Amino acid sequence: MQDRIEEVSVRKVVASEFVSLDGVFGSPDQWHFQYVNDEMEETRKEIFATADAMLLGRTTYEEWAGFWPLQGDQGPAGYMNNTAKYVVSKTLAGPLEWNNSTLIDGDVAEAIAKLKQQPGKDISILGSGALVRSLLRDGLLDELRLMVHPIVVGGGKRLFEDGGDQKPLELVDSKTLGTGVLYLTYRPAGG
């Protein structure tokens, strides 16, 4: 009889972001929706289906906690409202009011390591640019998925600001949507 070694799967931390050709990810409500179609909706559903928890930064949490609870529980609102949310902030005070929200105000690396060891699907990050940059810099981001929209916004909040450290990435998947949006999946190089 052969001994079976069960492989323990560790959850990944995966950031999924909308960005313009010039790197803007802020205020997607002003430039993203013209590219939404059934194909993009299917891609969004796939992203949601692979994760059962979210990491959010303070700014994204505050914006979304004032919006999503008022949208009901159908479609994206159901996912946002019912999914476990872990909010990284040194300035927010708990307990957090939005359903299924937990504050991470201590050692972020330790908290994420514990989350990754828990059973479940991946842990997603949507928005939360400062958190994405911090986790990528510190080696805590396992995957970066970018939906690069074929538009030059001309100004706005960039996903990667000037002055950051270089971080080599490896392209592991790419898909071109019918609207010209590129769906690119990267992992830290050598990881």
Give, region by region, the residue ranges found by the protein language model.
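Short, Lys/Arg-enriched N-terminal segments with co-localized hydrophobic residues
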Residues: 1-9
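Portal/gating segments that form or line small-molecule/metal binding sites
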Residues: 8-140, 150-191
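Non-cysteine beta-strand/loop elements that form the S-adenosyl-L-methionine
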Residues: 147
